[in-house]
Amino acid sequence: MANPVPSACCVVLAAVVVVYAQRHSQQDSHIQYERVGADVTMKCGSMDWDAAVTWTANGTDIDDSHLNGSYLILKNVDLTQSGQYSCYEGSSWHLKYQTYLRVGVPPKEPVLMCRSNNYPKGFYCSWHLPSPTYIPNSFNISVIHGTREMVCEKDIFPKNRCHIRYLQLFSTVKYKVTLTVTNALGKNSTTLTFDEFAIVKPDPPESVVAKPVPNNPRRLEVSWQNPSSWPDPESFPLKFFLRYRPLILDQWQHVELSDGTSHTITDAYAGKEYIIQVAAKDNDIGTWSDWSVAVHATPWTEEPKHLTTEVQITETTSTSTSSFMPPPTTKICDKGAGVGSGAVAVCWTAGLVLAAYGVLFI
């Protein structure tokens, strides 16, 4: 006879699967987008208006004051009310409806910028929104040169950027770039029109170094390198703009250099720390780069020497002389030491004492 236990287990398991399938077939789960400040009404799936239901938000029961029959009413929603909302039937707690509420705003006009930092290879365009929407956005960009639509290859990083390769150099035909941003609550767009030469802007110079010039207290030697992104400095040379100032002042001094990647500052204040930056630009077209990373340097200063003053010499001589003077000799009687009979008496007394000692030793 077959064991009835496995058969019973199979029946129970089948029943669980059927109930699970029924519950999920009865529920409607999706994402619902609403604007900040809107009034939101949620219906509990196919349940009647007067059905007994329970609503939860992120697993927490919602007070009945927000219900109109079986409908959930949310007034003037804000960002904090985003989350998962679920509706259950009566006391059985059968899930009848589930939605994820996303509260946000439609996009404002995007900020679009196009620039060529590797001329003549091509240019790139980057964009961002002036303020967050709090919900997902999608961006679409189109680039048209004359009657030709060009491909803008999206960069992996940063994600809101793409680059375009020049198909024709020195063209007088303008480029037209249109960016459209869309989300579940609306869309917006912006357009740029420009000449090829107008967007040329190199990256800042690299490896800027400033150091003092030996034996020159008013000079600083500054050197730098072309930006590594500039592909052909021989055919498309750069010129440079140097600015510098001592930290004690706010006013910059400037020098424009048409060639070379070094310069000697000759009017620095001796002993004062300087801050120095360099910018770059194509010799003929485009605009100046941003400033390089600031470097600091101080002009050469002479090592202080030990100077001995005349007073120090006198004191040293006096001290040395006194240290080698013989100790004073005590005299029994000095002719000029005493004044009057008192002094004479002292001398005679001392003489008699010495004479007495002499007699004893004879």
From Swiss-Prot:
A motif (WSXWS motif) lies at residues 288-292. GO terms for molecular function: interleukin-11 binding; interleukin-11 receptor activity. Heterotrimer of the alpha subunit, LIFR and IL6ST. It is a lipid-anchor; GPI-anchor. It is found in: Cell membrane. The gene is CNTFR. The lineage of its organism: Eukaryota, Metazoa, Chordata, Craniata, Vertebrata. This is Ciliary neurotrophic factor receptor subunit alpha. GO terms for biological process: ciliary neurotrophic factor-mediated signaling pathway; positive regulation of cell population proliferation. It comes from Gallus gallus (Chicken). Residues 106-203, 204-304 form the Fibronectin type-III domain. Belongs to the type I cytokine receptor family. Type 3 subfamily. Residues 23-103 form the Ig-like C2-type domain. Residues 335-362 form a propeptide. Binds to CNTF (GPA). The alpha subunit provides the receptor specificity.
